[in-house]
């Protein structure tokens, strides 16, 4: 490394000079794009030419085969202008097959080349062979059909997930929930349906702050829900601003002791590095106290009565409150799963209370509720839901 402030310190005077370098570099790349090995042409039938990139090349090949010629673009920025002109001059009709926004199509048309694209193909969702064949040819491709329909598998929180009890209580209380990115985003799905908004990482707290200041939503009937790793990633500054700007709402930090959704990565609150080495553990409660938050509670979210009482207490305060709903992710290897529950069918009254938590291990039959013991983790939440003592614990 060599010190070069003129290159690396982007103060206005330096930025103006570096802008010239960037534009020259981009111009050089544009000239190279025409000979770039990532851009390939395949000529077959020249009545139709397909311009595509990525997976749409494979789909198009399966639909049109040798009945079309192809320009597969591997370098999409900058686009290979001369290669595009040369390809289009050798085919009678051009169709740009690209997913979502018509980036390549708009560029081709700006070059004065007539082509089809989004006038035939949808601007939404990802493509498939069926979509391309139907939109361009008006035909359905031939596929091997399955004798049985594949069952629907909607995304769902795992059996024993510590977020489940929290969202059950929030739904029961009827509060507005500003959500965030993580496993707990699934709190928006049936039967819980507790999350009202989710935008991006950290937006739960900032969004709640905005609700406080803009009005229209009672701050004492609204909460933010954010995970421990997301809080460390981009929630800390939002909470600090809530305190600074005298907001009045409750922030719930759902601490499952890991970064769950993306594959159990460590984070600053777990006490381990990404390599698994022991390191200093950032205490969420200490951060909250350092901001001057007086009401900081730590509650096990599976203790739904305590959690409900704690949320009600925090919502009644004229200040920022924090509840840390702390229970480790059930998929952590150190979490014991040495028991499971069954349903005593003689006691079951088919009231459906156990179904309200949305546990995938529980289903309802003509004879009452049934628990799949291979899925049950013994979290006890269903036992707390049942008013008739139907749930019976078994050892593994």
Task: Tell me what each language-model feature is.
Residues 1-157, 162-166, 175, 179, ...:
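Flexible, low-complexity linker and terminal segments
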Residues 30-32, 146-157, 179-187, 221-234, ...:
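Charged, low-complexity, helix/coiled-coil-prone segments
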Residues 101, 183, 231, 258, ...:
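Short, glycine/acidic-enriched loop or turn micro-motifs at the edges of active sites
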Residues 145-205, 214-217:
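Active-site diphosphate/adenylate-binding microenvironment
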Residues 188-324, 334-335:
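Thiamine diphosphate
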């Amino acid at each position: 490394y060599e010190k070069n402030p003129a290159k690396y310190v982007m103060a206005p005077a330096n930025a103006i000079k570096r802008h010239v370098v960037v534009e020259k570099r981009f111009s050089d790349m544009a000239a190279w794009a025409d000979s770039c090995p990532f851009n390939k042409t395949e000529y077959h039938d020249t009545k139709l030419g397909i311009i595509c990139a990525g997976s749409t090349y494979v789909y198009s090949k399966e639909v049109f085969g040798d009945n079309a010629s192809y320009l597969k673009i591997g370098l999409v920025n900058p686009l290979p202008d001369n290669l595009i002109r040369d390809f289009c001059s050798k085919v009678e009709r051009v169709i740009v097959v690209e997913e979502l926004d018509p980036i390549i199509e708009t560029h081709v048309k700006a070059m004065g080349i007539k082509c089809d694209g989004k006038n035939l193909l949808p601007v939404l969702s990802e493509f498939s062979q069926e979509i391309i064949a139907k939109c361009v040819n008006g035909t359905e491709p031939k596929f091997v059909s399955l004798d049985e329909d594949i069952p629907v598998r909607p995304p769902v929180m795992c059996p024993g997930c510590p977020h489940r009890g929290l969202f059950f209580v929030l739904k029961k209380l009827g509060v507005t929930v500003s959500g965030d990115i993580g496993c707990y985003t699934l709190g928006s799905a049936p039967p819980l349906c507790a999350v009202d908004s989710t935008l991006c990482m950290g937006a739960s707290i900032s969004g709640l702050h905005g609700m406080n200041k803009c009005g229209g939503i009672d701050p004492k009937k609204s909460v933010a829900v954010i995970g421990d790793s997301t809080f460390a990633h981009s929630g800390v500054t939002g909470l600090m601003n809530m305190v600074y700007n005298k907001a009045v709402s409750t922030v719930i930090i759902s601490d499952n002791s890991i970064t769950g959704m993306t594959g159990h990565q460590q984070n600053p609150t777990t006490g381990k590095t990404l390599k698994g080495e022991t390191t200093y553990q950032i205490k969420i409660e200490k951060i909250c106290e350092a901001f001057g938050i007086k009401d900081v509670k730590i509650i096990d979210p599976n203790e739904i009565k305590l959690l409900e009482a704690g949320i009600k207490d925090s919502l009644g305060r004229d200040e920022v409150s924090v509840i840390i709903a702390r229970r480790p992710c059930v998929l952590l290897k150190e979490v014991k799963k040495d028991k499971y529950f069954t349903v005593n069918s003689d006691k079951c009254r088919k009231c459906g209370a156990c179904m309200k938590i949305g546990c995938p291990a529980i289903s309802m039959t003509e004879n009452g509720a049934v628990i799949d013991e291979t899925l049950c983790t013994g979290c006890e939440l269903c036992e707390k839901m049942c008013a008739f003592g139907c749930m019976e614990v078994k050892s593994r």
